[in-house]
Amino acid sequence: MSEITAAMVKELREKTGAGMMDCKKALAETSGDMEAAIDWLRAKGIAKADKKSGRTAAEGLVGVSSEGTKAVVVEVNSETDFVARNDAFQDLVRGIAKVAVSTNGTVEAVAAATYPASGKSVSDTIKDAIATIGENMNLRRSIALSVEDGVVATYIHNAVSDGLGKLGVLVALKSTGDKEALNAIGRQVAMHIAATAPLAIRPEEVDAAVAERERNVFIEQSRASGKPDNIIEKMVEGRMRKFFEEVALLSQSFVINPDLTVAAAIKEAEKAVGAPIEVAGMARLLLGEGVEKEETDFAAEVAAAVKG
């Protein structure tokens, strides 16, 4: 069994909010496997969920850019927030986002594309900026969405400048209807995605491994009730239905009007658009996602911003 260190216990406490002794026991029961320890605590009802996905550390900016029926969201990291507030760095990120629209959107394609202002590749332009600004930086992520007919709406939460911030969202809507009205509902849905971070557009599209992990946690929690297996099975199925509803975009309660699901809100918007609307894709980039940093309640922030 792996040695359980104080650092491991501290990390588990930060991720779950569980007590020190509970964290130590969870790590001991799972041979020091951090992810398994999180699930062990959840199964015992000691921790609700792994908090790490919303915790970030990398500085820099997320930028969005669109052209016609295509849009991109990119993340460029820097070492400090001071540099992220620098005009030269902001111009660089904005320029990279504009270049990215003309590519297939992958990091490799964007890095190799020509940056107009320098005549060099984006990758070499970043290297030059490192020498000029004096701080390491890199193009970390890039995602592009497009539709043949419709719009790709964009949204930056708490923008620090036009098209730049720490959380960026794209949502692709297919429709032959009025593009202005379509973009209006698209922006609202993008704001909703910023607030709720759905795992998939539809329940059936939720990653199978994620669903299986939740199911296993629910099974262990239900067994603690001491009820018969047939009752436990029904309990688990009910909780899984609720889980899918909560993490799939279209079945979520709409942040802007909680009386409607997102699907119902889009259906309602079809009246103004004048044609059916299909959600064809979505992307959400939170700066530094996956690295530890103080957590921010984006759901509360976005909801407050929407309600004015």
From Swiss-Prot:
GO terms for cellular component: cytoplasm. Gene3D superfamilies: 1.10.286.20, DNA helicase RuvA subunit, C-terminal domain, Elongation factor Ts, dimerisation domain. It is found in: Cytoplasm. Keywords: Cytoplasm, Elongation factor, Protein biosynthesis. The keyword ATP-binding does not apply. InterPro entries: EF-Ts_dimer_sf (IPR036402), Transl_elong_EFTs/EF1B (IPR001816), Transl_elong_EFTs/EF1B_dimer (IPR014039), Transl_elong_Ts_CS (IPR018101), UBA-like_sf (IPR009060). Belongs to the EF-Ts family. Associates with the EF-Tu.GDP complex and induces the exchange of GDP to GTP. It remains bound to the aminoacyl-tRNA.EF-Tu.GTP complex up to the GTP hydrolysis stage on the ribosome. PANTHER family: ELONGATION FACTOR TS, ELONGATION FACTOR TS, MITOCHONDRIAL. This is Elongation factor Ts.
